[in-house]
Every structure is written in structure tokens, then in C-alpha cells.
Amino acid sequence: MSNIQNMSLEDIMGERFGRYSKYIIQERALPDIRDGLKPVQRRILYSMNKDGNTFEKGYRKSAKSVGNIMGNFHPHGDSSIYDAMVRMSQDWKNREILVEMHGNNGSMDGDPPAAMRYTEARLSEIAGYLLQDIEKNTVSFAWNFDDTEKEPTVLPAAFPNLLVNGSSGISAGYATDIPPHNLSEVIDAVVYMIDHPKASLEKLMEFLPGPDFPTGGIIQGADEIKKAYETGKGRVVVRSRTEIEELKGGKQQIIVTEIPYEVNKAVLVKKIDDVRVNNKVPGIVEVRDESDRTGLRIAIELKKEADSQTILNYLLKYTDLQVNYNFNMVAIDHFTPRQVGLQKILSSYISHRKDIIIERSKFDKAKAEKRLHIVEGLIRVLSILDEIIALIRSSDNKADAKENLKVSYDFSEEQAEAIVTLQLYRLTNTDIVTLQNEENDLRDLITTLSAIIGDEATMYNVMKRELREVKKKFANPRLSELQAESQIIEIDTASLIAEEETFVSVTRGGYLKRTSPRSFNASSLEEVGKRDDDELIFVKQAKTTEHLLLFTTLGNVIYRPIHELTDLRWKDIGEHLSQTISNFATEEEILYADIVTSFDQGLYVAVTQNGFIKRFDRKELSPWRTYKSKSTKYVKLKDDKDRVVTLSPVIMEDLLLVTKNGYALRFSSQEVPIQGLKSAGVKGINLKNDDSLASAFAVTSNSFFVLTQRGSLKRMAVDDIPQTSRANRGLLVLRELKTKPHRVFLAGGVQSDTSAEQFDLFTDIPEEETNQQMLEVISKTGQTYEIALETLSLSERTSNGSFISDTISDQEVLVARTR
């Protein structure tokens, strides 16, 4: 018969993964609600206790303990066992350490511990209370992995370890994050709940107001703590403890003495220093980790004029000096993972301790009764001592003596065994008194144990007494301060930024930088660093407190605070937007750049190749949350081939749109509605099917120029294009030719000397040259031509203009721009 079974992969995977999930949920990552331990932690404690590796004895090599645990109870890698052992020894991870370790057991800086062959370990004193009475049949045992030895499924847990030390872990479909608490407060809450089983959460929180982290800190948010204790989920703010320390010379420094739970100190110091290096907060001179064996201390030295409170607020908001701690209190309850609140945790622990105390009392009672039975036999022997001695002397051997005692004097098997093994010195008068006293003590003990077993009130009194003994022995003060409200961190951004003069430059290809006036003035404008195939489109003097807006041909806008731009030399290329903006496309170009002081007022107009136009408010461009990594839309394009032709600030003038086929339309800018960023706009000009928009500009002068792809140029009067309404076809500004027709390559206003300053992107740059508007044309063969637009004579509307050179018509235009 074949052992091969045909099963679907879906069924096999589902069944196997379900089995695996159940294993890692119950046997690996989640703690038991009764003793607060994961299986590996329980096995470590039990194995070390079984081997006598306890607090009152000397330390033993960690490797020996790990080997015993792995060989007897936990058949997994030694690293997982050692890591768990090390964590239980770290006083910055546990409120009460369960393992004491000699040697390097890691640090708050995330340093790894020394190898287990170098360190030594033993159980801590309080860990002994988790294992107390385990030898008295108080908990159930199960066979280990190879059925050679039994291990406990839970520990007796004489204190509520789940709350005291907390727990964290991730399993299949479940995760847990239970914070540590103060031992005294937890025990007080348990004692109160023993007396008041239906105690309200509010009353319990009078005894246990919140977590108590081993690293201290300030916990904010009483309402969230209550929510977490009620539902098992919640989020609180954990803030570092800081103080402002005065230094000589009027300087100050921020001193950090406590940091949030689970925060890596070295990483925190590095992040704070990164803030200094990147000048995100001006005013930080130095960041030092001054921690030593006396305690944690991080010093943040400030400049003399620095605003210490504003800098501290910034660091709290943008570094791990303040973090959110998320409660997710999941534990194994009756073999099932459950999200539990405070009342459920306490009641489960009380129920567990009830079982432990009753089982322990039954064990002790049975032991006392067994001993009492023997003591009664010994006392009876002493009353008939001569007869017993004679009977034993007449017996053939020990077995015969025992049988004679049982037959002649009705002793039990146990009593007979005790009599025949009795040592002669025990027959003195003193020992008779001792036996009688022992009998009385045993009877009292049995009575007490019977009361504990039979009377619930007596049992609970024992439970409370034992808890109070643990509290008395191990109580320590609360480390974390609790604050009812979460404080909102307000940062005066303006006060963080040192106002400095700088020059901002942007290229069409997306390179940008800021340059100090010293570096800028040491070079000429032509020495700007850029790629050979790129073009400088924007240079302007600005303040570091201002803002830069970049509008692209694909309808995206990019925001950058000036102070966040990389400060580089004028001859450096700059930083490309693709390094930070994840959605900056390869074919995307910068169309327009603008520096603004505020976003309170201002309008922009955008015109696309498909002839659509819109106005939108600058207020909608105020910094968005993901501005550092993503651009946002300012206009919706109709299709993938559509591009934005013009973007400019709105002025109260007419707009003039010119198409490639030579149609020009003039209308008032007030006809264009103000719309949201996601809209595509309205029709600006009625295009023919084979036509598209070439240029659009505001009418701010009396004339404009038209350049064709063949290199023909003309200047014509604005009045030749009368004002009409938007969405019309417009008038032709070129004469149609049957062969080699002219198509508009670029059109724009011809600015006068007085009006040019308003539109010149380089007005803040000191130049000796006259401010004359020039048209630069580069042919496809690389020839460059420059024409002073004001020197052109006015042409008729229907003329095609004049070629700028004799050979340009054969070469055609590659690039054209005004400056």
C-alpha cells in the first residue's frame, strides 16, 4: 500500500501555517497572563532554579546555564536563549530584574553583550518569588521536547510580574506591548481588588495610576492611560526629563537626565547632533554624552543668544527626546491570545494565586498529616518502650521486626518503618517532650491549612499577607512622573531660523542651491555651476526666512524653505530635486520659480498646451506635510502629452495667448476663474485639432514679439490684437505659406526700460550693463544669435517677419529665451 496522499497545496499550506501560527502564539512571543513570562523566559528561570543557580550562591558561567536550558527544555539556537537571559538582566529594560549578571550585559546605547562564555549569571532574589513553592505541586507540568523531563507550564508567581516588568513581542497576527509598572503600586491594586472584586477602574487607578518605566521620564495623558487600562489599547506621550543649566558668559545648556523607555541613547545623541550639523536649529554649539556609572546625562550646549526653550521644543518634537508609547496589552489567557485590560489582568492573577495557595496548602497538609501519623507512633512507642525493645530483639531481621510491630501493636507500615529506624539517642526524656511539641505544632498547622483550603476569606488573607511581604522587601520609589495632560509642543519656527542674506539659483533641469553673498560676489554670473545641457532660469537675492516655490511643466509645485536649501559655492552645480522629491519625473522641467515671504495673499495663472487656463490662490500652496519628499499638483493636465506653457503671478492686465499655428487671442485676466489646485481650468482659447498653445503672457507693454521655428522674428503692436473674450479662436499673426510654413516657436512682450525690472529674474544682481531685453536664439546646428528686441521695427499683423540670419531658415531654432 502506498503512503503517498494527494492533497491540494492550498489545504496543506493552510493547515501547516495554522499549526505553526498556533505554536508561535502560544509557545514563543506572547506572555502568559498569570506569570507574565514567555516560554523561553520561564524555561530559563526554572532551569537555573533547578540547577541551584540562585541569588544566595555564587555566579555561574552563562554558557553553562544556556547549555542546560537548550539541552533540557528549549531546543532552539543558543543566541535566542542568551538574548532572553541578557534582557532579563538589563535594569533599563525591566522594572525588577530577574537575572543578575556579571560582565558586559549590553547598554542603553545598544551595545551588544559580551559572549556568554565571558559573562556569569544567577537568579535575582525577586526571581525566587516567581518560583516559590514550585516543588509543592502548585502548578501543572508537561513533558519537555524529548519526553525525558517535565517542565512547568506556568510559575507560581508570588508577585504580578506581567504588570511589574511588562512585555513586548510579535507573533503571527498578534503583537503585545505591556509597559512596566511600580511593584508597590501593583501590589496595592491587587490587595484592593482582593477585598473589592468588583472594584471600578477609577478606584483601581488610585492605587495604580500608570506605568513606571525603569528609565524614568515623564508620562503624559491620564485619559489615554485609563483607555488603555479599560480596553488594552491606548497611546501616551513619554518625554525626557530635562533642565536648563546656566553657564559662564551668559550661555546655557540643556541637560537630559532621563530618556523615554526603549530609546537607544547613542542613536538619540546622534540625531540631536545631526540637527546641529544640518543647522536645522541654529544655536546648538555641541552635543555631548556625559553619562557615567553615576547616571545618564546628555549635555546640549547652546550659543549665547539662543532661545533654549524653542530649541528644546524642537528637539522634543523632531527627535526621540519625546516618543509615543502604544499600549497593546495582549496575553495568553487559557491558551488563547486576548487583549486585556487592567481589571482582567488583576483578576486573572488573583485567580492564579488562589489556585497556587490552595494547592500548596493541600500539599503541606498532606505532608503534615503524614508526619503527624509517624509522630503519634513514636510517642506511643515511648510509652511501651520495654515491650517494643523486647519484641525487636526477638525478631529475626528488620522485616520480621516490622511485621511483628504491625501485628502485635497495630502500627501502620509507615509507623513501623519509623520505629525500626529510630536511633537510640531519640529515646531520651528530652526527645519525648520534643515529639509532643511537634505533635501540637503539626495539629495547629493542619488546622490552619484546613482553614485556608476550606475558607476563602482565610485564603485571601494569606494571599494579601504574602503580597505585602514582597512589597515590604522589594518596594522602591516611582521613577516616572505622571502628568494628566499631553502638552502641545509649539515651535516658533521664525525664531529658530537665523535671518541671513543669500542668493538662490534654479536651473531648468531641476538643480537648485543657495549661495552666500561672499561666494556669489567673488564670481561672475556666467561662472555659475551647471551642466552643459542645462539652463539657469532663476537667480535672486533672498533671506533665509523666506520660501521658494518651484512650478514644473508637468503641473507640479515644489516647496522649499530657503534655509533648508544646501549652501554651496556659486560654481557648484547644486542639488538635484530627484535626490529628495520622489515623484520628480525624468522629463520634468522647472517652468517658473518664485520667492515669497508669506502665503497670505497672491494669485497665479497657469496655461497649458491644450489651451486651458486657471487662476489659483497662493494660500493653497502653504507647506504640506510631505513637502520634503513629494511635490503636489497645482493644475490637472488633460493627458500625458499635455504640458504647462506659462505660469506667472496674476496682475490686473490682459492676457495674450499665441498658438503654434499663429492664432493670437487677448482677453482680461478677470475672465479666468480662481479654482482649486486639483482642477484642470477652463478653456482659454479655442484650438484647431492640429494646433496647440505656444506662449502666453500678460500684456504689460505696447508691443510683443513672435519668433517662428524657421528663425523669422517680428515685433507687432498689442493693439493689433483687440481685446475679446476667452475661449475664442483669435486672429492670425502669421501669413500661411503652402511650402515651409512658419509656426510660432516663442512669443512674448517687449518690455520697455521702465517695465522690464518687474519681470527680470535677475534684478537683484548688480550689473554694469544696461537693462536691455535681449532674445537669445540657438539653432539646431549650435549657432547662437542675440537680438535686442527694442531695436525691432513694428510689423503688420499678417507679416511673417524677417529672418535673424541668412542661414537660420535651413538650421531651424532649437532654443530661444529672453533675458
UniProtKB/Swiss-Prot annotation:
Keywords: Cell membrane, DNA-binding, Isomerase, Membrane, Topoisomerase
Pfam family, one: DNA_topoisoIV
GO terms for cellular component: chromosome; cytoplasm; DNA topoisomerase type II (double strand cut, ATP-hydrolyzing) complex; extrinsic component of plasma membrane
Active site: Y118
EC numbers for this chain: 5.6.2.2
Quaternary structure annotation from Swiss-Prot or TrEMBL: Heterotetramer composed of ParC and ParE.
Function: Topoisomerase IV is essential for chromosome segregation. It relaxes supercoiled DNA. Performs the decatenation events required during the replication of a circular DNA molecule.
Protein name: DNA topoisomerase 4 subunit A
Lineage, uppermost ranks: Bacteria, Bacillati, Bacillota, Bacilli, Lactobacillales
